[in-house]
Design a protein with these regions (language model features):
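Double-stranded beta-helix
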Residues: 9, 156-214, 238-240
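Short, surface-exposed loop/helix-turn segments at secondary-structure junctions
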Residues: 56-60, 129-133, 179-195, 244-249
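Histidine-centered catalytic micro-motifs
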Residues: 125-133, 170, 211-218, 231
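Short, structured patches in soluble enzyme cores that scaffold and shape functional sites
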Residues: 114, 130-132, 151-155, 167
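Non-heme Fe(II)-dependent double-stranded beta-helix
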Residues: 1-13, 20-128, 134, 252-261
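Non-heme Fe(II)/2-oxoglutarate
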Residues: 45, 49-51, 60-66, 162, ...
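A short secondary-structure junction signal
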Residues: 123-130, 137-139, 159-165, 174-178, ...
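Short, conserved beta-strand element in jelly-roll/cupin
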Residues: 103, 136-158, 200-201, 232-237
């Protein structure tokens, strides 16, 4: 199993491509069970970050994150999944190793591994944004040093707030040096509704995304959760500007973290 030239060409031209589930049904169910174990506090790891969803559905009213805040199905974002052996094994699947080796190189680390959730009848309206820029506080943020792999933990549909993208928008580069959200004027110019594409997926399916691709997501208007698992792989030589000694989890290459348990 390896990434094809056609998939890489699609990533280059459109800024994304879709993949089928890469693990067995049993292994995928283990991931779903482990995710529930962590959100409910049955398994806990020091250093994971938990952010509850807001009540207003507005992005600017989302509460700050922190440590584990008790069993809940209402977590919006949880980071630090590389601490768990089940998720670490998934992140190191040979197909993702092939992807990162072809795009980044031999030394690959994890900028972040996060769970994103839109609870039933809720969820946050996440406006158009790009992943990267000086706001990340990194020693480098060139486009070819990053790639994001997003896995559908549940079916992801228009009704439950699936990701929307503007195909080809990664070729614009960063629309601001800081990155992240864009202005209303930029939305009108670069992301009109008629250009948007909904990335619908069945559970287990995967989207590989260019970090500079404009993307957003809406609220969940169904009675079931819409959960996704997102991993941002990056060049392992990158450090934090304000803390060069900070060690990002190394996924492959020298000093790679080991799977335990």
């Amino acid at each position: 199993m390896e990434i094809t030239e056609g998939q890489l060409n699609q990533l280059d031209q459109s800024g994304f491509f879709k993949m089928d589930q890469v693990i067995s049904k049993k292994e995928f169910q283990e991931i779903r069970t482990r995710m529930e174990d962590i959100t409910q506090g049955r398994i806990q790891y020091s250093g994971m970050s938990f952010q509850l969803d807001g009540s207003s559905k507005a992005y600017d009213s989302v509460p700050n994150g922190g440590g584990f805040q008790g069993p809940s199905d209402n977590y919006r974002k949880i980071q630090g999944w590389e601490k768990d052996p089940v998720f670490l094994k998934y992140m190191r699947h040979p197909i993702f190793r092939d992807l990162t080796q072809k795009l980044i190189g031999d030394q690959v680390s994890i900028y972040r591994a996060m769970f994103m959730n839109k609870p039933p009848w809720n969820g946050t309206n996440l406006p158009y944004h790009q992943d990267g820029g000086s706001g990340w506080g990194l020693s480098s943020y060139r486009a070819n040093q990053f790639v994001t792999v997003w896995t559908a933990i549940d079916d992801s549909q228009i009704e439950n707030g699936c990701v929307q993208v503007i195909p080809g928008s990664h070729k614009l580069g960063l629309l601001s040096d800081r990155g992240h959200t864009i202005t209303e004027e930029q939305v009108k110019e670069y992301a009109p509704e008629e250009k948007s594409v909904y990335l619908e997926a069945q559970m287990g399916e995967i989207f590989v995304l260019h970090n500079f691709l404009l993307h957003k997501s809406g609220i969940n208007q169904t009675n079931k959760p819409r959960r996704g698992f997102s991993v941002c792989y990056m060049d392992g030589t990158i450090t934090r500007i304000n803390n060069p000694n900070h060690k990002f989890p190394v996924l492959s290459g020298e000093n790679a973290i080991k799977i335990t348990g």
